[in-house]
Amino acid sequence: MFTVLLNKRAQKDLLDLPKNDVRRIRTTLNELAQETEPWLLVKKLQSHEEVPLYSCQVGHYRIILTIDHGHLIIFVITIHHRHSAYRNI
């Protein structure tokens, strides 16, 4: 079982979203935390090899995250609409 941590940017992103989307995102993050191999449920981004980044789709939003396999932590970096999710990461 993994622990989900959100950085300050991701916390701020959640505050800017509609409540029903926030509920769906939280449900998805909880489901990822319950998985024994959450990296199988997300898409690995190709341009980040030194620290692998993953993308998780929830409706029109994308959750950009990293997974620390050793410490069993899912660290959420940002949550944005799909049109702007991959900028500045």
Regions found by a protein language model. Give the residues of each.
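A generic structural signal for beta-strand entry/edge sites
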Residues: 1, 51-53, 71-73
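Conserved N-terminal entry element of GNAT/NAT acetyltransferase domains
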Residues: 1-8
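Acidic/histidine-enriched, beta-strand-rich ligand/metal-binding domains
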Residues: 3, 13, 46-47
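Enriched for short, Lys/Arg-rich terminal
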Residues: 8, 12, 16, 27, ...
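Residues in soluble alpha-helical coiled-coils and helical-bundle/repeat scaffolds
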Residues: 16-19, 37
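Hydrophobic/aromatic residues within well-ordered alpha-helical segments
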Residues: 21-24
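A short, surface-exposed loop/turn module that caps and links secondary-structure elements
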Residues: 30-56
